[in-house]
Amino acid sequence: MISLNLSPSLNPGLLHKTRTCQQPTRLSALLVTNPKPFNHRHPLGLSPIPNLQIRDVSAKPLLSLTNPESSSGFSRKPRSIAAVGSSDSNPDEKSDLGEAEKKEKKAKTLQLGIVFGLWYFQNIVFNIFNKKALNVFPYPWLLASFQLFAGSIWMLVLWSFKLYPCPKISKPFIIALLGPALFHTIGHISACVSFSKVAVSFTHVIKSAEPVFSVIFSSLLGDSYPLAVWLSILPIVMGCSLAAVTEVSFNLGGLSGAMISNVGFVLRNIYSKRSLQSFKEIDGLNLYGCISILSLLYLFPVAIFVEGSHWVPGYHKAIASVGTPSTFYFWVLLSGVFYHLYNQSSYQALDEISPLTFSVGNTMKRVVVIISTVLVFRNPVRPLNALGSAIAIFGTFLYSQATAKKKKIEVGGDKKN
């Protein structure tokens, strides 16, 4: 075995002595170039020979050129081919890169527009046909159960035909999901009860107060919020109060249903963050599908107990009111399918965009839904009622901005730590 120690101050004579002191080796076992005068570009005195390999017949490397930092005490990082190419690139290549970036931005903008467009459209369709069905069949427990049933069937079809990856279901996951599914059930049925009692626009105005409950419950559980978040909920409270006082179709049951729905969905979100931390591999759509199935198991037995005896006579009244059974079936079917679709789109939108963009989009969604339902059902709106609704929705926008800044600060602090 021949051992060589190369450094910038290598003495060729020392190399000769080292070789003569060792056992004789064959000429093919060693390849060394003749020493040359000191060259500033190559301080080892070696010319740069591409792919020069120095090997011994014994299969062990005779000479290994490693990182200079570990052998000679200095660092010399070679310029990569990509770096050389980029420095000498012509303006045409730079313009091509700029065009590619512009096309990518346009594609993302188009994709974002499609996601938001589908989300808004599906939400509008659900709210319109859900209200149409409830106007002739005022039994929200059955209708809410059917909507969960439609979503459950939809997800089972996707999983069965491998149109969407099926999540790995385990006993710990089901146990962790029991709480969020229960609160989701409470939020969904309460909203349906509210829709059956009052105008859709009024329910959505009251549901815009969800951030108020989120801040209160999260604070009780130990979370802290900056002053800007607390100030942002003031216009929400004021706007909802003004809208409730001036609402033409005011009903205490409708108001209570919307408020309970806020509590249910807030507790669902809080409980999900705490109980599902160990199941982050399950994406939002699969999580919502599992919640829908469990919520159906929660809701339908209670629905039979609450209003099951009224379903048959209520059905006959609904058919008599509409005129044809197919029209009534069409309304109910659309309410169920589009209830799932708009929730599916919301989860997909959340995967594609930032939480801030999502919250702003969700705020604007309420505006679009309120205006659409007012136009479709021709609900009378007083000026003060419209003002209160606008103040409440503006408050939700301020809340989304304030919470987004809070999350940015938290993420920045985590990176520094």
UniProtKB/Swiss-Prot annotation:
The keyword Acetylation applies. It is a multi-pass membrane protein. The chain crosses the membrane at residues 109-129, 141-161, 173-193, 198-218, 225-245, 247-267, 287-307, 318-338, 384-404. Residues 1-82 form a transit peptide. Its main location: plastid. Residues 66-102 are annotated as: Disordered. Keywords: Acetylation, Chloroplast, Membrane, Plastid, Sugar transport, Transit peptide, Transmembrane, Transmembrane helix, Transport. It comes from the Eukaryota. Residues 91-102 have a biased composition (Basic and acidic residues). The modification N-acetylalanine is found at residue 83. GO terms for biological process: phosphoglycerate transmembrane transport; triose phosphate transmembrane transport. One of its GO terms (cellular component) is chloroplast membrane. It is found in: Plastid, Chloroplast membrane. GO terms for molecular function: phosphoglycerate transmembrane transporter activity; triose-phosphate transmembrane transporter activity. Residues 127-243 form the EamA domain. SUPFAM superfamilies: Multidrug resistance efflux transporter EmrE. Widely expressed. Sugar phosphate/phosphate translocator that transports inorganic phosphate, triose phosphate, 3-phosphoglycerate, xylulose 5-phosphate (Xul-5-P) and to a lesser extent ribulose 5-phosphate. Does not transport ribose 5-phosphate or hexose phosphates. Provides cytosolic Xul-5-P to the chloroplast, where it is used as an intermediate in the plastidic pentose phosphate pathways. Belongs to the TPT transporter family. TPT (TC 2.A.7.9) subfamily. This is Xylulose 5-phosphate/phosphate translocator, chloroplastic. It comes from Arabidopsis thaliana.
